[in-house]
UniProtKB/Swiss-Prot annotation:
Full protein name: Lactate utilization protein A
Family of this protein: Belongs to the LutA/YkgE family.
GO annotations of cellular component type: cytosol
Listed GO MF terms: oxidoreductase activity
Gene name per UniProt: lutA
Biological processes, Gene Ontology terms: lactate metabolic process
Family matches, as InterPro entries: Cys_rich_dom, LutA
Pfam families on file: CCG (PF02754)
Domain of life: Bacteria
Function: Is involved in L-lactate degradation and allows cells to grow with lactate as the sole carbon source.
Species this chain originates from: Bacillus pumilus (strain SAFR-032)
């Protein structure tokens, strides 16, 4: 099986280790991974800021970048969710709208792909310690991907999982929200950090780099000894 990797801007520019872990996990499962170099930003920052024309341009670029893919896999629920906006954005053009629907249908978040398409629940990972999991808004509310991450994490050897109190509360990142509504965002991430501390976890795990950067930044400022890990990194741990 061959997939095209949608690496996302945050991973490409700030957390390339997550992209590397994603590739290594997939290859270990027998998947051939290709990286289309023509891929660009999915357009979510422009979309959230109301720049429709710029978003449409980004959407068309992404549709062309992945038009030959059978499967597109991304280690980001947020960016996959953006692909679901493309058909509506391009509804005035039947040709582009149809292509947008095709892209949305063949794109999978990493854990969703592993569990639902590869039918794998144990990737052979091992990580000693206690962890809790942050369920990002896009993963739970828009994509309805709730079970796959927990299924995979439950099979990581030597890893103990503790439920996160108020788990579905937003961390306060929200893309441009954290820039436009900084005081509110700060209060939200403080509440998230408090919830994480209540678990006594050594690791906070998530599937969206935006959330993890926000939470990790706050933990660092507060000098909290809790390690932030993307789920791809956990699944790649040995």
């Amino acid at each position: 099986m061959k997939v095209h990797l949608f690496v996302t801007c945050l991973i490409d520019t700030m957390q390339p280790n997550v992209g590397k872990a994603t590739v290594e996990v997939l290859e270990r499962l027998g998947v051939e991974v290709e990286f289309p170099e023509s891929q660009v930003c999915c357009g979510q920052p422009a979309f959230n800021s109301g720049y429709t024309k710029e978003t449409i341009k980004a959407a068309k670029n992404m549709i062309k970048a992945f038009e030959t893919a059978e499967y597109v896999v991304t280690p980001s629920g947020s960016c996959k969710a953006m692909f679901l906006e493309y058909p509506q954005l391009l509804k005035e053009d039947p040709v582009w709208s149809t292509q947008a629907e095709a892209l949305a249908e063949k794109t999978y978040e990493l854990t969703e792909f592993i569990v639902d398409i590869l039918h794998v629940t144990d990737v052979g990972a091992s990580l000693k310690g206690n962890a809790t999991y942050h369920t990002s808004c896009h993963m739970t509310r828009l994509l309805r991907i709730k079970e796959a991450p927990f299924t995979l994490l439950s099979n990581v050897k030597d890893l103990s999982m503790t439920p996160l109190p108020r788990a579905e509360n937003c961390c306060g990142f929200g893309g441009t929200f954290s820039v436009k509504m900084t005081p509110i965002s700060e209060q939200m991430v403080d509440e998230k950090v408090q919830s994480i501390e209540e678990t006594g976890a050594q690791y906070i795990i998530g599937a969206d780099c935006g959330c993890l950067l926000n939470i990790g930044g706050r933990l660092n400022r507060l000098d909290k000894p809790i390690q932030v890990m993307h789920i791809a990194e956990v699944l790649n741990s040995r």
